[in-house]
């Protein structure tokens, strides 16, 4: 457990991800010398958390591909194009869990990640970062997780060779999840 973590009670129940207090992001190397960070600004998600039988837990996410944002309009447009996500033809990225396990505050979620019609299994370790009741009476739970994937596994193959060697965009991309979920009434 980290020093900032405050697991205050049993978090069993059904939750809806709060997109205004969550971040679904990514980090990739650019020109092999620096990292570019981005995120998806529109997404929905639900979770059923079963603390007694974690294997009965489940998570589903739907991410609007066209909501990708890196802070650079030209790059964002390129990422939305057919070279990468082809957001017009493939408006959603989805994740559906297939297995969940827990060890204290550490959760492992295995699931099917679908991008551009290609589905691959990924295993994402998460840390339960705490629970709280917000000023509006909502019970919230937080999770942070990350996994590194090879974008080519989903058909995201565009690249450009550099004169100095290497390529413009790394094949490996780190997917980052900072999630605040609200317990359903």
Question: What is each PLM-predicted segment?
Answer:
Residues 1-185:
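Low-complexity, acidic/polar, glycine-enriched regions of mature
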């Amino acid at each position: 457990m980290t020093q900032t973590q405050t697991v205050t009670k049993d978090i069993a129940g059904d939750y809806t991800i709060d997109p205004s207090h969550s971040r679904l992001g990514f980090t990739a190397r650019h020109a092999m010398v620096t990292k570019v960070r981005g995120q998806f600004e529109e997404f929905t998600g639900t979770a059923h958390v079963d603390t007694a039988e974690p294997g009965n837990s489940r998570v589903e996410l739907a991410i609007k591909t066209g909501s990708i944002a890196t802070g650079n309009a030209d790059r964002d447009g390129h990422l939305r194009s057919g070279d990468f996500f082809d957001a017009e033809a493939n408006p959603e990225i989805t994740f559906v869990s297939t297995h969940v396990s827990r060890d204290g505050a550490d959760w492992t979620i295995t699931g099917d990640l679908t991008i551009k019609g290609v589905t691959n299994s990924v295993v994402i370790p998460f840390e339960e970062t705490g629970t709280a009741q917000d000023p509006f009476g909502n019970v919230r739970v937080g999770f942070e997780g990350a996994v590194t994937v090879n974008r080519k596994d989903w058909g995201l193959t565009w690249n450009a060779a550099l004169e100095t060697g290497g390529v413009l965009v790394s094949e490996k991309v780190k997917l980052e999840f900072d999630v605040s979920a609200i317990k359903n009434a």
